[in-house]
Amino acid sequence: MAHHARWTLSQVTELFDKPLLDLLFEAQTIHRQHFDPRQVQVSTLLSIKTGACPEDCKYCPQSSRYKTGLETERLMEVEQVLDSARKAKNAGSTRFCMGAAWKNPHERDMPYLEQMVQGVKAMGLEACMTLGTLDETQAQRLASAGLDYYNHNLDTSPEFYGNIITTRTYQERLDTLDKVRDAGIKVCSGGIVGLGETVKDRAGLLLQLANLPTPPESVPINMLVKVKGTPLADNDDVDAFDFIRTIAVARIMMPTSFVRLSAGREQMNEQTQAMCFMAGANSIFYGCKLLTTPNPEEDKDVQLFRKLGLNPQQTDVMTGDNEQQQKLEEQIFNADTDQFYNAAAL
């Protein structure tokens, strides 16, 4: 379905109800119409300001409301961030994402954030940030600095959202996505599976994303990472097939978006990850940690790519000499290197 045709909840729930193999076949068919099925986009995520967040997101160890043992850190120095970006590039990432545990960035932080974006872009990497809600001026300033992507997840359906977060409204999240889009920055927005939501809620989340005026260019689908001290620490595990279904439905509904395996990949075995790629996932976060949760060791990713015959995707902002593509391909096929352990200095 073209993205200008609005989906209905009944259409989405019908997709979730399909026999799994039929759903995977449909998703993979659509995926191949828009993407090279062997290409996977590789991103690295760095927490540039950790913990002490005033929000009450029940899944998040960075909230100041929960005792999770997380060490809080102030905003990193610009050069520290750029050093991590260099390591990520050397390890083969094509996009560098910077995350700060804020409700929203303060004016005093904006010059440093702009310098980070400019420095990352100067390396030939795509730059992405996730900083909480933005106003129009902040979005414009980040766009002027060269920011490619802004991440702001919807997390779940509007109906279930109030069970998870009370300090920021669903509409505030949608408003931030509008401001980012209006500033000319690409949108990265997805959600989390395993919050205690129903299949109808998963359908509702994807409905919101797919029915945006322009669907997000990047859609991260996270599996809840249960962190001791957070209210969701004792939630039931997510069934792997339910997660794979969510990936497949996202691919069908948003055929031209990158669908990213994000948090929770540490909990997935190789077979589950392979089925996610079959379902249409074509982007991963690659590095030691995803903000404050574990990510599979990088050499395991290298080995999995090699087993599945997958290749890292070249970034759009490269200068033309293919140096970065060659670096990652060399390491994919010579996986005895330890450079990947330095992909994200968190």
Curated annotation (Swiss-Prot):
Amino acids binding [2Fe-2S] cluster: 97, 128, 188, 260
Record keywords, A-Z: 2Fe-2S, 4Fe-4S, Biotin biosynthesis, Iron, Iron-sulfur, Metal-binding, S-adenosyl-L-methionine, Transferase
Binding site for [4Fe-4S] cluster: 53, 57, 60
Annotated ranges, domain Radical SAM core: 38-256
Pfam families hit by this protein: BATS, Radical_SAM
BP GO annotations: biotin biosynthetic process
InterPro entries registered for this protein in UniProt: Aldolase_TIM, BATS_dom, Biotin_synth/BioAB, Biotin_synthase, Elp3/MiaA/NifB-like_rSAM, rSAM
Necessary cofactors: [4Fe-4S] cluster; [2Fe-2S] cluster
A GO molecular-function annotation: 2 iron, 2 sulfur cluster binding
Reaction it catalyzes: (4R,5S)-dethiobiotin + (sulfur carrier)-SH + 2 reduced [2Fe-2S]-[ferredoxin] + 2 S-adenosyl-L-methionine = (sulfur carrier)-H + biotin + 2 5'-deoxyadenosine + 2 L-methionine + 2 oxidized [2Fe-2S]-[ferredoxin]
Cofactor mode of binding and number, as noted: Binds 1 [4Fe-4S] cluster. The cluster is coordinated with 3 cysteines and an exchangeable S-adenosyl-L-methionine.
EC number per UniProt: 2.8.1.6
Gene3D superfamilies in the record: Aldolase class I
Pathway participation: Cofactor biosynthesis; biotin biosynthesis; biotin from 7,8-diaminononanoate: step 2/2
SMART domains (alphabetical): BATS, Elp3
Coiled coil: none
Function as written in the Swiss-Prot or TrEMBL entry: Catalyzes the conversion of dethiobiotin (DTB) to biotin by the insertion of a sulfur atom into dethiobiotin via a radical-based mechanism.
Family: Belongs to the radical SAM superfamily. Biotin synthase family.
Subunit structure: Homodimer.
Protein's name in the database: Biotin synthase
Origin species: Pseudescherichia vulneris (Escherichia vulneris)
